[in-house]
Amino acid sequence: MGLCKCPKRKVTNLFCFEHRVNVCEHCLVANHAKCIVQSYLQWLQDSDYNPNCRLCNTPLASRETTRLVCYDLFHWACINERAAQLPRNTAPAGYQCPSCNGPIFPPANLAGPVASALREKLATVNWARAGLGLPLIDEVISPEPEPLNSSDFSDWSSFNATTTSVQEERASTPSAPAFYSQAPRPPPSPSRPEQHTVIHMGSTEALAHAPRKVYDTRDDDRTAGIHGDCDDDKYRRRPALGWLAQLLRSRAGSRKRPLTLLQRAGLLLLLGLLGFLALLALMSRLGRAAADSDPNLDPLMNPHIRVGPS
């Protein structure tokens, strides 16, 4: 169990594998929609994670994702295509998670940000509306934009030649006379960005296992307190009296204001009173011990006291 760092400060068992922080369901939907999130116990058992979709083996951040009630994350297009291949008379229990075989449809009595977001997403397709008990709708298929590929340009030499000829024409064009004032060109509109061709020459094997991202949310200028722990020595065995050494170190390092005359007098009076009470207790104990061993105080040794039948 851990405490989420959001303003709600809720106790949660969920742990973000990428940012390495405890998250509640509200932060999970709002800020960690494409992160691998599971229980903290699973993080302790195995901290490795796969940032790719388990259905298409492509990075989860590349397309729109959806999170099931078991907190497994997939591409929405992959889940939709997989469920659309099932027969129309499939029961709601037949739609299962590809990873853990859990139910895709959230239970009716389950309330929470993750379940609500999943219901809103499932309500956009007919196969899920039938499982949720909603009337069917006319689906509008919106094709996803295909990324540009370097293979679209078959002859790069012609492309370079065209670019060179355009630059030569611009250089050969005479500049306008100085007495003609040219209006400044307006900046390009942000709504219509220029299209560029992006060529990725790296291999796709590096995307299968991405390194863990570490985001340290602690301030550098803030010194670690008594309970401060970093990730390196978080699970290291500590000595039995380590807390006492840290406490003494923190007490010795902090500056104290000098005591005033009244405070000194009160402290001396308190110490004197404690010493007087200790002296009284000691003298009382010693006096009782002396009285117990005194024969004059023993009733059996007194000749005027007769014990027994008369």
Curated annotation (Swiss-Prot):
Q: Identify the domain of life.
A: Eukaryota
| TM helices/strands, residue ranges | 267-287
Start and end residues of each stretch annotated as Disordered: 162-196
Give the primary localization class: Golgi
Give this protein's Gene Ontology molecular function annotations. zinc ion binding
Q: Which InterPro entries match?
A: ZFPL1, Znf_RING
In residue numbers, the zinc fingers (RING-type) are: 53-101
Share the record's PTM remark: Phosphorylated.
Cytoplasmic domain ranges by topology: 1-266
Q: Where in the cell is it found?
A: Golgi apparatus, cis-Golgi network membrane
Kindly list the ranges of residues that form B box-type zinc fingers according to the record.
1-43
Q: Which residues lie on this side of the membrane: Lumenal?
A: 288-310
Alphabetically, which GO biological process terms does the record hold? vesicle-mediated transport
Q: Give a GO cellular-component term.
A: Golgi apparatus
Q: Which keywords does this chain's UniProt record carry?
A: ER-Golgi transport, Golgi apparatus, Membrane, Metal-binding, Phosphoprotein, Transmembrane, Transmembrane helix, Transport, Zinc, Zinc-finger
- On whether Nucleotide-binding is a keyword of this UniProt record, the answer is no
Membrane topology recorded in Swiss-Prot or TrEMBL: Single-pass membrane protein
Assembly notes = Interacts with GOLGA2/GM130.
Give the family, as the similarity comment puts it.
Belongs to the ZFPL1 family.
Domain text:
The B box-type and RING-type zinc fingers although degenerate play a central role in function of the protein.
PANTHER family linked to this entry? ZINC FINGER PROTEIN-LIKE 1 (PTHR12981:SF0)
Q: What does this protein do?
A: Required for cis-Golgi integrity and efficient ER to Golgi transport. Involved in the maintenance of the integrity of the cis-Golgi, possibly via its interaction with GOLGA2/GM130.
The protein depicted here goes by the name Zinc finger protein-like 1
Q: Give the organism the record lists.
A: Mus musculus (Mouse)
Q: What is the lineage of its organism?
A: Eukaryota, Metazoa, Chordata, Craniata, Vertebrata
